[in-house]
């Protein structure tokens, strides 16, 4: 089998209408009221966040008692304390009560139910849409992040809370000021609309975005980390973001590496070698 034939097979599979259609038909026909609710995207992202944080939180709580996992800790001498975990939990809870829940209720009250298209996206459209949204968000947040580090007032007023800790951990992902949380939520909601994504693609992007954001802050460089699965240093991952918390004027892009390399803010990072 030639390389061209392999690529053709992958392309044909990715562009087949029928691959995702059975899944989409099932959820659309059996759970339409839930999916059409303006509350659904909010519930999806919030629940995804807490579910995805839990495994990393377990790693932080068990710490050195779990050597098979602890050997992948990027900064092994800096485990989050109980006080740090409680502080980040409190900030996250405060933001959700003050900002996320009221915004969700407002959408539920004033936004009409969302129509569900009958046709599912192709697999290629789904993957391309998720990737496109991540790349667009990466540019937006790179600019926002750069400005909030370079302009002192912006940093102190809005972003400094996220840099309370030089060694990131999963619960610190949403240890954010209200302005930053609103900005991130706005882009996450707007970008799929700008890219005219299918609803299934939009929801998949939201879950993937939550996952990679939590992974970036987890403080562990596992063999299955996204940055190790994507070759050529295109994707930064937890090691890259860990360096940002140690050297705050570097590595501003949240996920990928190209913007920092283009604008001279890239700081080299080494993938952690597991300790024996």
Curated annotation (Swiss-Prot):
GO terms for molecular function: C-4 methylsterol oxidase activity; iron ion binding; steroid hydroxylase activity. Residues 134-265 form the Fatty acid hydroxylase domain. It is an enzyme of class 1 (oxidoreductase). It is found in: Endoplasmic reticulum membrane. A motif (Histidine box-1) lies at residues 144-148. It holds the Pfam family FA_hydroxylase. Its EC number is 1.14.99.-. One of its GO terms (biological process) is sterol biosynthetic process. Keywords: Endoplasmic reticulum, Glycoprotein, Iron, Lipid biosynthesis, Lipid metabolism, Membrane, Metal-binding, Monooxygenase, Oxidoreductase, Steroid biosynthesis, Steroid metabolism, Sterol biosynthesis, Sterol metabolism, Transmembrane, Transmembrane helix. InterPro entries: Fatty_acid_hydroxylase (IPR006694), Sterol_Desaturase_Related (IPR050307). A motif (Histidine box-2) lies at residues 159-163. A motif (Histidine box-3) lies at residues 240-246. It is a multi-pass membrane protein. The chain crosses the membrane at residues 39-59, 90-110, 126-146, 175-195, 199-219. Its main location: endoplasmic reticulum. GO terms for cellular component: endoplasmic reticulum membrane. Glycans are attached at residues 30, 164. Belongs to the sterol desaturase family. May catalyze the formation of 25-hydroxycholesterol from cholesterol. PANTHER family: STEROL DESATURASE. This is Cholesterol 25-hydroxylase-like protein 1, member 2. It comes from Danio rerio (Zebrafish).
């Amino acid at each position: 089998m030639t390389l061209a034939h392999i690529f053709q097979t992958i392309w044909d599979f990715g562009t087949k209408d029928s691959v995702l259609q059975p899944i989409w038909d099932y959820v659309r026909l059996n759970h339409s009221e839930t999916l059409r609710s303006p509350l659904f995207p909010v519930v999806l992202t919030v629940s995804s966040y807490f579910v995805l944080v839990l495994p990393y939180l377990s790693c932080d709580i068990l710490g050195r008692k779990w050597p098979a996992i602890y050997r992948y800790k990027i900064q092994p001498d800096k485990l989050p304390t109980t006080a740090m975990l409680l502080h980040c939990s409190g900030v996250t809870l405060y933001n959700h009560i003050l900002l996320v829940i009221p915004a969700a209720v407002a959408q539920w009250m004033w936004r009409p139910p969302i129509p569900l298209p009958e046709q599912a996206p192709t697999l290629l459209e789904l993957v391309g849409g998720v990737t496109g949204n991540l790349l667009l968000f990466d540019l937006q947040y790179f600019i926002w992040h750069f400005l909030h580090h370079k302009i002192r007032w912006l940093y102190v007023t809005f972003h400094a809370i996220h840099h309370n800790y030089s060694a990131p951990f999963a619960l610190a992902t949403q240890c954010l000021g209200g302005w930053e949380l609103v900005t991130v939520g706005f882009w996450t909601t707007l970008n799929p609309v700008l890219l005219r994504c299918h609803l299934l693609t939009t929801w998949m992007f939201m879950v993937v975005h939550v996952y990679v954001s939590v992974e970036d802050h987890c403080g562990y460089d596992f063999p299955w980390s996204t940055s190790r699965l994507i070759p050529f240093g295109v994707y930064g991952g937890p090691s890259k973001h860990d360096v940002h918390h140690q050297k705050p004027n570097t590595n501003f892009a949240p996920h990928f590496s190209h913007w920092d390399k283009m604008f001279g803010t890239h700081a080299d990072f080494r993938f952690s070698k597991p300790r024996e």
